[in-house]
């Protein structure tokens, strides 16, 4: 059943949900984190105090030297290549960045990957990571780490298609690196091609496919390298690690055998294990799904390329090229599966097609034949690399519906060599395009968007490199690529003529970033000035295979060779095909178009030195990179701009859950515009106004911290909802448990009370209606609790007494109370003495407390009787508290005892003496005063006081309540408001059923001001003096049983003036009688008649005096002390206030301090009823002071004995 929204509940619901959705918890105790590393420099360049290229360089240098290679510029990551393993890419480090925003963790490439993946899932927008920097700066490593992170966090389980996609995506790294990377002078693992990897994800954020686009492989490296560089890694891996089968089938030998791998004299590289990486390449081929036949064909083509390089030509008698070693031709023809003669013919004979259509075959010289041989090798490798990429894409093709994607661009860095040709021009052109994207998306686009959205901010100047891109790629006016193509059209048959024509076009160009020179030209790139050599540049741009080579490939019997050369040879088509410059321009523009459709993340890589040293930091080189990467402009714009912007609709779609006014139970409920909804959301989330601005169509958030706070609140929304449900359920359980507890408590109270009431009623039956009762014995609140002294307790005075009595563990006290025993005195009348009476389930004890050594109380077990030995208990019919125990001992007399709780004691004894309890109730008390000699104690009702006492063999008491009296009804307690069922946010507002309290509350209505009073208060009225007001209040008699109610609405009297400060101690002044010239530094020179201040007096005849700011000693006989001026009288008190009728009141004499009124006096603390003393006629038995310890008990006992001797009476009535 759906939720129905009601208009009348909207405001209340918004109010209720507004305060409880936060779910903020109490902060944890702050502790010092000893493991946290001290930050080196600043982790975000926007926090620099001074924004300059030098300050950025200095900060990067500090962090590089402290092994911190990552630094932020807002959301842009700056990475410095460490040239060593820092151990920062482990699984533990990776997991620490999972689900964290950028500010929660130190800068890292994993944070960029997490941000891209999170934004893709959260905002359903395609993402791309653009990695830029020069060669050797660490772009490829950064790309691999991003792929590593995404593969780990993107879910999908350990098996199935998704995990297979992950494995294949990761396997593309070793495969494409082996075929596309090589050692250069600047980088041991330099990418010699561009790669854009796009990973596709389903709606759950799981990878379902991928595709790779490659750009401009440096195929010239296949046939030649400079000294200390290498060919592509795969050639060294293959020649060193090929299996015996490959060596026999393809004739593979060591790399020193082949010209293409031995020309640079570099076969091994530090940090690269060719054999291990060869195995990684084979494993990657298996993971991607290359069959064994496909792998064999790939390595067959690699062997053909190596043997092609070993084709060496010599001049024949006519000066044309001839093959030096026919065996190499035969083996190469075997590998390509072509006829050897056709192979030689295709390489040494050039086929020319003039404009008239005539076909001319021209023998080639050695240089031309060598160039044709190299062209064949480059074409095979270039097409083989394209086939591998396409084959990988087939394996990575999406197997589910793709929702979004993350692209990773790893492309060659900016290059400046001593000799720069067409390859460097293309590489630097692509980097210019990437720089243009960076400028458009981070600098220009940002400022343009601020202006378009009418956002207030300070513009930042920057360099736009669009003029450089137009210089290279423009058609009208013609740029560098167009000039090359036109030169090829003009003189296509002669490469030298093409170069001269191209140079003439360069000379005719007018561009501030182009400088023509003799045989070369200079382009001012964003990364620096680069000089390009014109010689051979147009031929490389033409990039065409001779038709003889194409015919040779088409005639091969090898099917795989046909697959990697899919294009057909048109013998009659003389139309100029697209040049290499056209292809790279088309690819670069397609890449730009793809990137512009994504939300970019940037990694700017920096190379710290040219020596690949882990410790060297070349300050000038890094400063140059900082300048051409535009880091300073990026920092300035980041500091002045906004970290996040989004359209109103998307912002509301993302964050509407955060406001109770825009959402209810996950549903969007806002009826107004999206812009108003954005304002409401930002208001309800308490985002400060200076942290956001609203443009025309978008909302702008200034700092990333604010965005992270919104994201955190959104992530916590569902947790909070679940917490609310859990809280309500737990509250219900607590309510149910509390209800059950209250029922149980009520039942226990009733049951326990009923037990005690039952004992009390049994006491009435024990007396058999024959003994008069005391008034206190039949109170309705009386309960028979038994152990009043706590003998059964584990601690306290009762436990100490139990230990002194040495009671066993199985002996439990059923009754304990203080009482008295009648002691026989030699030569005089017997006197009562205080004792403690304890009845257990086995015995009857009489215990005495005496003072021992060191004034410490001591427990003396005076007598004990087994309950079975007690033959009878004798008591009178009067209301007295005396009774005797008929023991019938032959050595001791029967005890005659006094106990105020005698009826309860009889009842408890009857419970533990089944069948042996004999209570005698008569006019006299019978007991053996001496062994075997019975005596009767008379009970006389002639006591002058309410308390009974023993004297001369008789107990004197008063008339009591009738013997048939029963206990009065239990008094009802004072009504109190019912306690809430739960605490905090109540389920029930009051008592059971949620009803409000029925306890009447006295509310005194406030009288309305009358006209006269209003007129009176309209002018200032003098207030009474506080003392007089207090005296007047004290003179009012207030009943002690009523409470004074405070009236907060009444005007309070002004506070009394503060007491005056104590008068300052008067100075002691003295008059100088005689002149005295000081002889020492500590003596003061004085003259007669001067008045000086005495600071200190000494008894040695010298006083310390002060004069004109200085102080020193003077002889006391030379001065005379002056009397101090009288202290001024205190200021008189202010006059009393005027009377109410306006007449001035007469001043009244100050009243003496009033006694505290009865109503204001705190009631005395009620003393707990002490059941330990009997109510004899003496104070010894009526002392009701609780005894906190044995010491107190003994003191009370001794005091009681003293009072008993003095015959003092008390007024207690039991």
Curated annotation (Swiss-Prot):
Residues in TH1 domain copies: 773-963
Binding of ATP, residues: 133-140
Swiss-Prot/TrEMBL keywords: Actin-binding, ATP-binding, Cytoplasm, Cytoskeleton, Hydrolase, Motor protein, Myosin, Nucleotide-binding, Repeat, SH3 domain
InterPro entries tied to this protein: Fungal_myosin-I_SH3 (IPR035535), Kinesin_motor_dom_sf (IPR036961), Myosin_head_motor_dom-like (IPR001609), Myosin_TH1 (IPR010926), MYSc_Myo1 (IPR036072), P-loop_NTPase (IPR027417), SH3-like_dom_sf (IPR036028), SH3_domain (IPR001452)
Record Pfam families: Myosin_head, Myosin_TH1, SH3_1
Domain Myosin motor intervals: 40-715
Domain SH3: 1065-1124
UniProt comment concerning the protein's domains: The myosin motor domain displays actin-stimulated ATPase activity and generates a mechanochemical force. The tail domain participates in molecular interactions that specify the role of the motor domain. It is composed of several tail homology (TH) domains, namely a putative phospholipid-binding myosin tail domain (also named TH1), an Ala- and Pro-rich domain (TH2), followed by an SH3 domain and a C-terminal acidic domain (TH3).
Name of the protein this chain belongs to: Myosin-1
Source organism per UniProt: Chaetomium globosum (strain ATCC 6205 / CBS 148.51 / DSM 1962 / NBRC 6347 / NRRL 1970) (Soil fungus)
Gene symbol of the encoding locus: MYO1
């Amino acid at each position: 059943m759906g939720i129905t929204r009601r208009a009348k509940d909207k405001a209340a619901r918004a109010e209720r949900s507004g305060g409880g959705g936060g779910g903020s918890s109490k902060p944890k105790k702050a502790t010092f984190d000893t493991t946290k590393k001290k930050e080196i420099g600043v982790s975000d360049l926007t926090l620099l105090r001074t924004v300059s290229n030098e300050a950025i360089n200095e900060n990067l240098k500090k962090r590089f030297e402290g092994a911190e290679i990552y630094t932020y510029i807002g959301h842009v990551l700056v990475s410095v290549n460490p040239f060593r393993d820092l151990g920062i890419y482990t699984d533990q480090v990776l997991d620490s960045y999972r689900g964290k925003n950028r500010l929660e963790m130190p800068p890292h490439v994993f944070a960029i990957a997490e941000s891209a993946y999170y934004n893709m899932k959260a905002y359903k927008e395609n993402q791309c990571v653009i990695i830029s920097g020069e060669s050797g700066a660490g772009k490829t490593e950064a790309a691999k780490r991003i792929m590593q992170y995404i593969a780990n966090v993107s879910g999908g389980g350990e098996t199935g298609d998704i995990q297979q996609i992950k494995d294949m995506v990761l396997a593309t790294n070793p495969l494409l690196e082996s075929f596309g990377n090589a050692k250069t002078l600047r980088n041991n693992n330099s990418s010699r091609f561009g790669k854009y990897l796009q990973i596709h994800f389903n709606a759950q954020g799981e990878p379902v496919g991928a595709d790779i686009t490659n750009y401009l492989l440096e195929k010239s490296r296949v046939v030649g390298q400079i000294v200390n560089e290498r060919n592509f890694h795969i050639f060294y891996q293959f020649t060193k690690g090929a299996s015996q089968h490959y060596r026999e089938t393809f004739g593979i030998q060591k790399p020193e055998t082949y010209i293409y791998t031995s020309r640079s004299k570099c076969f091994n590289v530090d940090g690269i294990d060719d054999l291990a990486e060869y195995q990684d390449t084979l494993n990657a081929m298996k993971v991607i799904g290359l069959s064994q036949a496909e792998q064999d064909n790939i390595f067959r083509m690699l062997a053909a390329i190596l043997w092609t390089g070993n084709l060496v030509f010599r001049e024949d008698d006519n000066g044309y090229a001839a093959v030096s070693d026919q065996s190499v031709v035969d083996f190469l023809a075997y590998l390509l599966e072509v006829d050897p003669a056709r192979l030689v013919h295709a390489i040494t004979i050039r086929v020319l097609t003039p404009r008239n259509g005539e076909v001319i075959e021209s023998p080639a010289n050695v240089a031309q034949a060598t160039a044709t041989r190299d062209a064949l090798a480059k074409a095979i490798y270039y097409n083989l690399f394209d086939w591998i990429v396409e084959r990988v894409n087939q394996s990575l093709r999406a197997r589910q519906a793709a929702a979004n994607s993350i692209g990773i661009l790893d492309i060659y860095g900016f290059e400046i060599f001593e000799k720069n040709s067409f390859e460097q021009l293309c590489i630097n052109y692509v980097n210019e395009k990437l720089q243009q994207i960076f400028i458009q998306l981070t600098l220009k686009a940002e400022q343009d968007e601020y202006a378009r959205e009418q956002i207030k901010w300070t513009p930042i100047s920057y360099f736009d490199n669009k003029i450089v891109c137009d210089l290279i790629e423009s058609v009208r006016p013609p740029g560098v690529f167009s000039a090359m193509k036109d030169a090829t059209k003009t003189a296509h048959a002669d490469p030298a003529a093409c170069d001269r024509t191209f140079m003439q076009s360069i000379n005719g160009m007018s561009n501030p970033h182009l400088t023509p020179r003799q045989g070369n030209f200079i382009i001012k790139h964003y990364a620096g000035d680069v000089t390009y050599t014109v010689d051979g540049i147009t031929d490389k741009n033409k990039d065409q295979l001779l038709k003889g080579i194409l015919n040779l490939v088409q005639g091969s019997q090898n099917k795989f060779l046909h697959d990697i050369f899919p294009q057909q040879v048109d013998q009659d088509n003389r139309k100029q095909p697209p040049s290499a410059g056209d292809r790279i321009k088309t690819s670069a523009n397609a890449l730009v178009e793809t990137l512009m459709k994504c939300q970019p993340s940037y990694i700017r890589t920096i190379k710290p030195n040219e020596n690949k040293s882990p410790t060297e930091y070349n300050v000038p080189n890094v400063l140059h990179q900082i300048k051409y990467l535009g880091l300073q402009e990026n920092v300035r714009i980041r500091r002045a701009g906004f970290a996040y912007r989004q359209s109103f609709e998307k912002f509301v779609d993302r964050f509407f859950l955060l406001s109770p006014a825009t959402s209810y139970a996950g549903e969007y409920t806002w009826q107004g515009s999206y812009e108003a909804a954005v304002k409401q959301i930002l208001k309800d989330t308490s985002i400060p106004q200076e942290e956001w601005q609203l443009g025309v169509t978008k909302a702008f958030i200034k700092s990333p911290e604010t965005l992270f706070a919104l994201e955190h609140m959104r992530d916590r929304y569902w947790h909070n909802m679940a917490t609310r449900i859990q809280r309500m359920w737990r509250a219900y359980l607590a309510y149910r448990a509390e209800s059950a507890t209250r029922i149980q408590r009520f039942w226990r109270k009733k049951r326990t009370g009923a037990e005690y009431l039952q004992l009390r009623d049994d006491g009435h039956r024990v007396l058999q209606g024959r003994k008069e009762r005391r008034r206190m014995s039949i109170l309705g609140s009386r309960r028979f609790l038994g152990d009043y002294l706590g003998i059964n307790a584990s601690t306290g005075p009762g436990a100490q007494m139990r230990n002194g009595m040495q009671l066993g563990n199985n002996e439990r006290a059923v009754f304990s109370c203080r009482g008295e025993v009648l002691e026989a005195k030699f030569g005089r009348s017997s006197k009562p003495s205080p004792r403690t009476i304890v009845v257990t389930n086995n015995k009857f004890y009489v215990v005495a407390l005496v003072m021992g050594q060191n004034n410490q109380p001591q427990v003396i077990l005076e007598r004990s009787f087994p309950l079975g030995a007690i033959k009878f208990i004798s008591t009178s019919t009067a209301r007295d508290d005396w009774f005797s125990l008929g023991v019938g001992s032959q050595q001791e007399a029967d005890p005659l005892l006094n106990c105020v709780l005698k009826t309860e004691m009889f009842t408890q004894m009857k419970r533990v003496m089944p069948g042996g309890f004999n209570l005698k109730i008569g006019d006299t008390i019978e007991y053996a005063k001496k062994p075997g000699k019975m005596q009767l104690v008379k009970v006389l009702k002639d006591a002058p006081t309410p308390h009974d006492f023993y004297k001369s063999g008789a107990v004197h008491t008063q008339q009591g309540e009738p013997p048939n009296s029963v206990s009065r009804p239990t008094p009802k307690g004072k009504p109190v408001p019912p306690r809430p069922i739960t605490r905090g946010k109540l389920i029930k507002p009051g008592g059971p059923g949620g009803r409000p309290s029925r306890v009447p509350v006295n509310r005194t209505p406030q009288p309305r001001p009358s006209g006269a009073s209003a007129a009176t208060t309209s002018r200032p009225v003098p207030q009474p003096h506080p003392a007089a007001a207090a005296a007047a209040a004290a003179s009012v008699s207030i009943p002690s049983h009523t409470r004074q109610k405070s009236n907060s609405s009444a005007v309070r009297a002004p506070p009394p003036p503060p007491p005056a400060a104590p008068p300052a101690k008067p100075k002691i002044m003295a008059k100088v009688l005689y002149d005295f010239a000081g002889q020492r530094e500590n003596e003061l020179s004085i003259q007669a008649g001067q008045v000086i201040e005495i600071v200190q007096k000494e008894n040695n005849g010298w006083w310390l005096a002060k004069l004109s700011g200085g102080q020193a000693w003077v002889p006391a006989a030379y001065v005379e002390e002056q009397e101090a001026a009288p202290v001024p009288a205190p200021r008189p008190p202010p006059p009393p206030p005027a009377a109410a009728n306006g007449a001035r009141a007469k001043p009244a004499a100050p009243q003496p301090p009033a006694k505290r009124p009865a109503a204001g006096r705190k009631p005395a603390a009620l003393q707990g009823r002490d059941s330990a003393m009997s109510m004899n006629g003496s104070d010894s038995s009526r002392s009701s002071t609780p005894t906190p310890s044995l010491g107190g008990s003994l003191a009370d006992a001794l005091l009681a004995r003293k009072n008993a001797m003095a015959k003092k009476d008390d007024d207690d009535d039991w």
